[in-house]
Design a protein with these regions (language model features):
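C-terminal helical cap(s) of enzyme catalytic domains, especially alpha/beta-barrels
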Residues: 71, 238-265
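Surface-exposed amphipathic alpha-helical tracts and adjacent flexible/coil segments at the periphery
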Residues: 2-8, 261-268
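N-terminal basic, low-complexity leaders that serve as flexible interaction/assembly modules and, when applicable
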Residues: 1-34
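Active-site beta->alpha loop and helix N-cap motifs at the rims of alpha/beta catalytic domains
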Residues: 2-12, 36-159, 164-185
Length: 268
């Protein structure tokens, strides 16, 4: 079985959810997930934002606020696994909800992320219910769960909550060290250990607009996430025009896996 580091478009097209998760696990913290704000105008004319982050080194692409139709066509065009955010809240538009109807609309997604944008106040119980609904509606699809930031609150979630999310999902989202207030590296490492102990992967998230900071800051965040034990580095959609600054994608990619793997990913 290949590591995600070594996979190209032909490999991704043949993967099921279990193989994708194992490919990430085998890559030892060297997977880059880039989030794209779907409604945002493209940073560069003539190409989509998703194409830009893929060109600069994204292994996985995550669509936020996706209201499009041809998800299968987008996946084929990008040559990368594509996931979609859903939110367990009735206060967000229908195309963002973790509802059965919306999940069926995004059934072609390679993975589903149960999370919350800043305008949606969502707790762990709501997330657990949503994870169960995803499992029921889209059997076999990997499910990620957790918050990329405070979502209107403050501070980090506790080990107990992380363990519960990890037991229910395939990967848990945990704010990377240095992002949300209080996200000290030893604390994040303990949360990562709790998630791993329950069998889940960990996605360390940079979703506090720091994905649009200078490259050195992003490199520091990326390395802190890797030191804490994260399997995947997430770079959010609030850098520039609905994506991470492309040069920051490259900087983070080189930091966590070196030029060899970074350049290979860009070329595949």
């Amino acid at each position: 079985m290949k590591r995600i580091l070594d996979c190209g478009p032909a490999d991704f097209r043949q993967m099921d959810g279990a193989v994708l998760l194992e490919a990430v696990r085998r890559s030892e913290g060297r997977t880059v997930l880039c989030e794209v704000l779907w409604p945002a105008p493209p940073l560069v004319d003539g190409v989509s934002n998703a194409e830009v982050v893929v060109a600069f080194g994204a292994d996985l692409v995550l669509l936020n606020m996706f209201d499009g139709e041809d998800l299968a066509g987008l996946k084929d065009h990008l040559g990368r696994p594509v996931g979609v955010n859903v939110e367990p809240s009735e206060d967000v538009p229908a195309h963002r909800r973790a509802s059965r109807e919306n999940l069926r609309r995004v059934a072609d997604a390679d993975f589903v992320v149960v999370t919350a944008n800043p305008d949606a106040e969502v707790g762990v119980e709501e997330m657990l219910s949503a994870v169960a609904l995803v499992r029921e509606t889209l059997p076999g699809a990997p499910v990620f769960a957790g918050k990329m930031h405070g979502s209107g609150g403050r501070g980090m979630v506790g080990e107990g909550e992380i363990s519960r999310l990890a037991e229910a999902s395939d990967a848990v989202l945990i704010a990377a060290p240095g992002t949300v207030p209080g996200s000290r590296e030893p604390l994040v490492a303990a949360l990562v250990d709790a998630a791993h102990a329950s069998g889940a992967l960990v996605v360390a998230t940079v979703g506090t607009s720091q994905e649009g900071a200078d490259a050195e800051t992003v490199r520091e965040l990326a390395l802190a996430a890797k030191r804490a034990g994260a399997d995947v580095l997430h770079l959010g959609d609030a850098g520039v025009s609905g994506i991470t600054d492309p040069m920051n994608v490259l900087a983070a990619s080189i930091a966590i896996r070196g030029r060899r793997h970074a350049y290979r990913r860009m070329a595949m």
